[in-house]
Amino acid sequence: MNPKVEYKQIQSHDEAENQVLQHECHQAKARKYYRCAVVIAIIITLLFCVLASQLLLFPLFSITSQTTTEIVLNKDIQCDDQCRFVLVESIPEGLVYDANATINPSIFQSWLNILTSAKSSVDIASFYWTLTNEDTQTQEPSAHQGELILQELLNLKQRGVSVRVAVNPPDSPLRAKDISALKDSGADVRVVDLPKLTDGVLHTKFWVVDSEHFYIGSANMDWRSLTQVKELGATIYNCSCLAEDLKKIFEAYWILGLPNATLPSPWPVNYSTPYNKDTPMQVMLNSTASQVYISSSPPPLSATGRTDDLQSIINIIDDAKKFVYISVMDYSPTEEFSHPRRYWPYIDNHLRKAVYERNVNVRLLISCWQNSRPSMFTFLRSLAALHSNKSHYNIEVKIFVVPATEVQKKIPYARVNHNKYMVTDRVAYIGTSNWSGDYFIHTAGSALIVNQTQSVGTSDTIQMQLQAVFERDWNSNYSRTFNTLSSWKEKCIF
């Protein structure tokens, strides 16, 4: 019996052809899918490369920018310059001290010195300009020194020295004449509209000469600041490290003097500084190792690294171990020019804390003249009230009065102690601001802070020089004990 055999039906020609066509179609589809997959893979690869570049390359640029900032801020705080520091004053005509009293070089002479030595540039940050007596419409002989300074400035362009002036908007045509003369001589002048930018004024008073020498202090560009107003400042010679740091503040004013200027936030890195209260510059001043930095106000004008002026003052008060001596024209724990009125107790609180918690000896020598605000004496009386034989809180307040003849009394905005400094057992602070809230919140100011306590055994430090000036004035016949509010007007008149 034959075995059962399964037979397959033989496909027809058409059926075979269909199978071939179907096979080729499948292959075509496969090739199409393959090509699509390759294209998709390429696109994904490209997208990955773009993403990688964003993750790797762009942060690299960011890191480069950040590194630039860090280089500026981590710059070596050691300065190799051998700087010469000179404490300078203007003593008003008719104000005479005892024969053995401390006397410092004049601001007029120091200004003349750095002007005559200028080789390439003079940059001046200023509140206003009245170096001639045209603003008073008089022929006051004591204006001669101011007129000499203005003439030296007008001659600088002829010597190939560039002059830049940053100034607050003039408040009267009479205060614009010096500015016009400077422009006519070839000086570059920019009006910094801080009233618009910060609701304050450009109250700073400093010079930078050849990026090597500088002056900073209380004296305005005013003939009275040389002969009719008591002023104090510092002139530093051969000190490019500090001069260049102060110049950064000037450059900030300069850029804000452009038309339609706005406040940068943050400031570009080239305005930053590595020198501040935490990392002061290590520099030799008068052959003495010193820690120095420059503070600034208001905060919106301070670039990265710059200590705000208020923070500097508070830090110095808190750092004092034995005494805090303050000599300023105005002192008030308020915002004097705000509407509505605002209480502003920051400095006041730290003074009280120093007296109460650390038994620090605090003395305030405040100016008293015809433009003094009556409210100031209310707050001064509050501070003075802390001192008594029972409390043993060591705080004293005196007022300083510059004498005036009948002729001198007719000179407007003169015959006043315009100083703006503080000295402790550790630090010397020389500033440009009055001590009320407005000057630290809205108004542009700056200060030089010097600490030489590391130089053990050094005689005649800058701190000692400033202390000697304070004690001379405190013990002089022009200083009067502050007792009651009712008597302050009588005490302000000689």
Curated annotation (Swiss-Prot):
Residues 59-494 are lumenal. Residues 1-37 are cytoplasmic. Glycans are attached at N100, N238, N260, N270, N286, N389, N434, N451, N477. It catalyses: Exonucleolytic cleavage in the 5'- to 3'-direction to yield nucleoside 3'-phosphates. Keywords: Endoplasmic reticulum, Endosome, Exonuclease, Glycoprotein, Golgi apparatus, Hydrolase, Immunity, Inflammatory response, Lysosome, Membrane, Nuclease, Repeat, Signal-anchor, Transmembrane, Transmembrane helix, Ubl conjugation. Pfam families: PLDc_3. The keyword DNA-binding does not apply. GO terms for biological process: immune system process; inflammatory response; myotube differentiation; regulation of cytokine production involved in inflammatory response. It is an enzyme of class 3 (hydrolase). SMART domains: PLDc (SM00155). GO terms for molecular function: single-stranded DNA 5'-3' DNA exonuclease activity. Residues 198-225, 413-439 form the PLD phosphodiesterase domain. 5'->3' DNA exonuclease which digests single-stranded DNA (ssDNA). Regulates inflammatory cytokine responses via the degradation of nucleic acids, by reducing the concentration of ssDNA able to stimulate TLR9, a nucleotide-sensing receptor in collaboration with PLD4. May be important in myotube formation. Plays a role in lysosomal homeostasis. Involved in the regulation of endosomal protein sorting. Belongs to the phospholipase D family. This is 5'-3' exonuclease PLD3. It comes from Xenopus tropicalis (Western clawed frog). The lineage of its organism: Eukaryota, Metazoa, Chordata, Craniata, Vertebrata. The gene is pld3.
